């Protein structure tokens, strides 16, 4: 009994090498397209570090133009409150446990802006779990 390979059972080396080349090209090009297609907020969320390294000691609530609450998660173990001030272009990190900041958040919860309410609710929920 002899074992002979049929010609149809063999894989030509030319198609195998082109298949390997195609697989490597796809492997290296897919992550680049995925990173370019992701929105900016998704890329920020994938950074595994805290945004707020230092906290502002005090701030006038009338100077706050926008308030963003980032709940605790895999990127940072603590809740972060970031305020955009009316007279500055930089963001300021605030202490989420400060009584004044809690009052500002409660005032925002009473407002009509749904997105702002959602951010403030995330802060209240995460603060109650800590």
Curated annotation (Swiss-Prot):
This is C-X-C motif chemokine 5. Disulfide bonds join 50-76, 52-93. May participate in the recruitment of inflammatory cells by injured or infected tissue. One of its GO terms (cellular component) is extracellular space. Keywords: Cytokine, Disulfide bond, Secreted, Signal. One of its GO terms (molecular function) is CXCR chemokine receptor binding. Residues 1-37 form the signal peptide. It is found in: Secreted. Monomer. Homodimer. The keyword Signal applies. CDD domains: Chemokine_CXC. GO terms for biological process: animal organ regeneration; antimicrobial humoral immune response mediated by antimicrobial peptide; cellular response to lipopolysaccharide; inflammatory response; leukocyte homeostasis; midbrain development; neutrophil activation; neutrophil chemotaxis. It holds the Pfam family IL8. InterPro entries: Chemokine_b/g/d, Chemokine_CXC, Chemokine_CXC_CS, Chemokine_IL8-like_dom, CXC_Chemokine_domain, Interleukin_8-like_sf. PROSITE patterns: SMALL_CYTOKINES_CXC (PS00471). It comes from the Eukaryota. Belongs to the intercrine alpha (chemokine CxC) family.
């Amino acid at each position: 009994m002899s074992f002979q390979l049929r010609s149809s059972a063999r894989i030509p080396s030319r198609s195998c090498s082109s298949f390997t080349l195609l697989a490597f090209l796809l492997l290296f090009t897919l992550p680049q397209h995925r990173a370019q297609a992701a929105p900016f907020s998704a890329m920020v969320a994938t950074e595994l570090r805290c945004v707020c390294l230092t906290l502002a000691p005090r701030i006038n609530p009338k100077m706050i133009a926008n308030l963003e609450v980032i709940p605790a998660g895999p990127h940072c173990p603590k809740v972060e409150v970031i305020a955009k001030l009316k007279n500055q272009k930089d963001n300021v990190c605030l202490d989420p446990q400060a009584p004044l900041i809690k009052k500002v958040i409660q005032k925002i919860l009473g407002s009509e802006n749904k997105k702002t309410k959602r951010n403030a609710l995330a802060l209240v929920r995460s603060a109650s779990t800590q």
